[in-house]
């Protein structure tokens, strides 16, 4: 896999030429985003959100099984990396996955790393 500097052309299709042409800026953004997603608790939050349109902080606390302050810290990290979007309604804050590409990535990670039970 060859990595090159910044290019002005659209990203190459690796299936066509076996290469990924990625800028240093894009590599940095991707690395930081994947690092944020890589924490087990944040990954659990993302899995919950991937299965719902949006979820309140209180519901995430109940489903994840940790304190609200801990959940809020992890949500803040994911929001800062623009992985999550939020909205406030009265005294509740709701979170959702902010980009459909993240949902696609979650599906790919599930297919690659998770055991799917056979029925």
Regions found by a protein language model. Name each.
Residues 57, 87, 105-106:
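Short, hydrophobic secondary-structure boundary micro-motifs
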